[in-house]
């Protein structure tokens, strides 16, 4: 018997036994340890399947994962004509699927549910001996594996929720698009950028729901839910010094490596000017109450006066908040010299900058030149991404997010935020499409910040709460025939 058939039969039996309609569950009743319901079991299986497919940006195969998820969608009942798997390279295919709405274009443009299925490379020897990055493990209330947090949880949830919606017979009013994509982490943009340039009609949307935001809990207490509505822009610069070189037995003052080192030291000490946007201002204002007293006071002070020296000292000392206040530039790669007994003729360093949305790459380049103050050091723009304007916080999207957050976690604030890292939302924002980073996946930054790193993990409870949150949000934004709370 297929999963869908068995689940439908079970639902029918349950309906016969329960003459009343159940109202929305709060988060405490969504997940019971060791007692997964059928929808959660399916989500776990899809999650496991995705994590155990190596989709590393250089050593893995993203197409394998896209094909596997396309197979799942066929099993859920999505017609072949509404499933697209494709990309510019054999190992870099994307999956785009469409759930047809009852009103089609009359209901407006589609809702796009976006997740990337490529991951940062991971080596077994870099992880704890008990874990393999491409083996799905559960231990002490956490799921472990590369991509568990970034971003295969959302991908698995989107696929699993299709089964639930199909079983219920739910039909959206507007079309719902699911896109699982390649090359978000790095690479020559075989994912969202390629889709928008080559198959724009497949991913055109009214709104985009993507990664970038999530809830925060600390010591078991749920604090707030965040919505990523802006992000800094990634640009790489090359610092380059050339020299005629010579024999190392006759050193000179004009050494290319030494000259570059001096420039790097200046860049390392420099702090870019402080900026506050409407989004970061609201973030600090609303987050202040949830932080330790000293940080909270600094957040309130910086909102009142962005030049407050005491507040700047406190916030700049915290790497998380320092990056939200200003453009940041850091050296990430270094090379120089060609022989152990020769003076270097070339020395280069890569400077990775995360640029505040109100600044340009050219402005940052000019700042670096001014700070280095050495015409012998070239500052070259190596690679840059398109500007990413902030998403307007529309009531028709934010109101359901607030409502569902309150249903599940009570009276906690929903706080807009700016991501210091990059997401694929930037491609849609550049085209004027509102993109919201929201997941309902809660974590404790003090212990769970492991994406891209050793022993990446996702709290088990958070995964199933996120599954429920995104299920309700999808129905609300796509036009549910019944109230979101009527499940």
Feature names for model-found ranges:
Residues 19-24:
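N-terminal signal peptide c-region/cleavage motif recognized by signal peptidases
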Residues 56-58, 90, 102-104, 117-121, ...:
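Solvent-exposed loop/turn segments at secondary-structure junctions
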Residues 142-143, 147-226:
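Acidic/histidine-rich catalytic neighborhood of metal-dependent amide-processing enzymes
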Residues 26-148, 165-174, 351:
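Acidic/His- and Gly-rich active-site-bordering loop/insert found
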Residues 1-14:
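Bacterial N-terminal signal peptides that target proteins for export
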Residues 39-47, 61-65, 69, 154, ...:
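Stable alpha-helical elements in mature extracytoplasmic
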Residues 76-81, 107-111, 172-176, 203-206, ...:
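Loop/turn elements at helix/coil->beta-strand transitions in domains of secreted/extracellular proteins
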Residues 25-27, 214-223, 227-230, 234-465, ...:
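Metal-dependent amide/peptide-bond hydrolase catalytic core
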């Amino acid at each position: 018997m297929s999963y869908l058939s068995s689940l439908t039969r079970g639902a029918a039996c349950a309906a016969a036994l329960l003459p009343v309609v159940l109202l929305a569950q709060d988060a405490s009743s969504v997940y019971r340890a060791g007692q997964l319901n059928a929808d959660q079991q399916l989500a776990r299986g899809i999650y496991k399947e995705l994590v155990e497919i190596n989709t590393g940006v250089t050593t893995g195969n993203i197409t394998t994962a896209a094909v596997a998820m396309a197979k799942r969608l066929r099993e859920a009942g999505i017609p072949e004509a509404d499933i697209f798997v494709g990309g510019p390279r054999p190992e870099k295919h994307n999956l785009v699927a469409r759930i047809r709405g009852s009103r089609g274009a009359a209901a407006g443009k589609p809702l796009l549910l976006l997740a990337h299925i490529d991951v940062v490379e991971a080596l077994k020897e870099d992880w704890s001996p008990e874990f393999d990055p491409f083996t799905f493990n559960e231990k002490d209330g956490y799921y472990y594996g590369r991509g568990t947090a970034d971003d295969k949880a959302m991908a698995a949830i989107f696929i699993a929720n299709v089964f639930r919606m199909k079983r219920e017979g739910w039909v959206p009013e507007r079309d719902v698009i699911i896109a699982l994509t390649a090359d978000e982490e790095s690479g020559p943009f075989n994912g969202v950028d390629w889709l928008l340039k080559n198959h724009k009609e497949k991913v055109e949307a009214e709104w985009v729901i993507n990664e970038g935001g999530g809830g925060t809990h600390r010591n078991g207490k749920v604090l707030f839910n965040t919505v990523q509505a802006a992000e800094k822009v990634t640009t790489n610069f090359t610092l380059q010094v050339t020299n005629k070189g010579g024999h190392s037995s006759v050193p000179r003052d004009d050494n290319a490596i030494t000259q570059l080192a001096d420039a790097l030291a200046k860049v390392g000490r420099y702090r870019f000017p402080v900026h506050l946007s409407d989004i970061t201002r609201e973030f600090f204002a609303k987050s202040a109450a949830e932080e330790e007293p000293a940080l909270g006071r600094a957040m309130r002070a910086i909102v009142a006066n962005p030049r407050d020296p005491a507040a700047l000292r406190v916030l700049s000392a915290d790497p998380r908040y320092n990056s939200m206040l200003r453009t940041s530039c850091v050296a990430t790669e270094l090379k120089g010299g060609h022989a152990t007994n020769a003076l270097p003729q070339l020395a280069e360093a890569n400077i990775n900058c995360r640029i505040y949305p109100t600044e340009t790459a050219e402005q940052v380049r000019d700042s670096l030149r001014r700070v280095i103050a050495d015409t012998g050091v070239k500052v070259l723009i190596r690679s840059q991404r398109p500007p990413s304007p902030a998403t307007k916080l529309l009531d028709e999207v934010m109101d359901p997010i607030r409502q569902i957050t309150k249903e599940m976690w009570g009276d906690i604030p929903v706080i807009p935020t700016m991501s210091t890292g990059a997401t694929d939302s930037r491609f849609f924002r550049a085209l004027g499409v509102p993109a919201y980073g929201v997941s309902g996946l809660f974590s404790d930054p003090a212990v769970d910040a492991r994406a891209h790193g050793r022993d990446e993990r996702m709290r088990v409870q958070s995964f199933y709460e996120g599954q429920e949150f995104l299920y309700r949000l999808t129905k609300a934004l796509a036009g549910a025939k019944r109230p979101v709370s009527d499940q």
